[in-house]
Regions:
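Iron-sulfur-associated redox domains of electron-transfer enzymes in respiratory
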Residues: 1-112
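Ferredoxin-like iron-sulfur electron-transfer modules
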Residues: 89-95, 117-146, 150-168
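Repeat-unit-sized solenoid/scaffold elements
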Residues: 107-117, 167-170
Length: 170
């Protein structure tokens, strides 16, 4: 029997809803960024970034793998992850979403893999794609710097989305 990988990319609004729907929260270091730091390649993004909810949070806390946080702290962590341009990846479980990893394209294994091999749909799914309003784009290139999978390029001083590479993270 096939075991499906139901990892999904979640926009900020959906992660906010997941947080609102839960009452137990835990946060742990991003294992990908932690490994990179140990190997001497420290990432400048948020380290304590992976959240678990409900019984998964209980398990992580009880086993010393994460610390308990409040709902308000979970909301603040999401805001910080968003400010850092991190991609909100959820694991899917028949009981609901139990984990959110806030991933960077430079150190997180799944995002680095899909970027290196140009395979965005292989590992990550989303129902969204980035969009650019050509009339309001100022050509500041902030979006190209924030895109964790390098799916935004500048064309004639206007941001252009490479839809084959976009994973719809926001």
């Amino acid at each position: 029997q096939e075991i499906k990988d139901d990892r999904e990319i979640q926009p900020y609004e959906q992660v906010s809803e997941i947080i609102e729907a839960n009452s137990k929260f835990a946060v742990a270091d991003c294992i990908c960024r932690k490994e990179s730091e140990i190997m001497g390649d420290k990432c400048d993004k948020l380290l304590e970034a992976c959240m678990s909810f409900g019984f998964a949070a209980d398990y992580y806390i009880e086993n010393g793998m994460a610390r308990e946080i409040s709902k308000e702290e979970a909301k603040q962590l999401l805001i910080k992850a968003e400010e850092d341009g991190l991609v909100h990846c959820s694991s899917n479980h028949k009981g609901g979403k139990m984990f959110i990893c806030n991933c960077c394209g430079c150190h997180c294994k799944a995002l680095a893999f899909i970027t290196k091999h140009d395979l965005p749909g292989l590992i990550a799914q989303s129902n969204y794609y980035a969009a650019v309003d050509d009339d309001t784009c100022e050509g500041c290139e902030t979006c190209t710097e924030r895109c964790q999978v390098n799916a935004i390029k500048m064309v004639d001083e206007v941001a252009s989305i490479t839809y084959d590479g976009c994973i719809g993270c926001g």
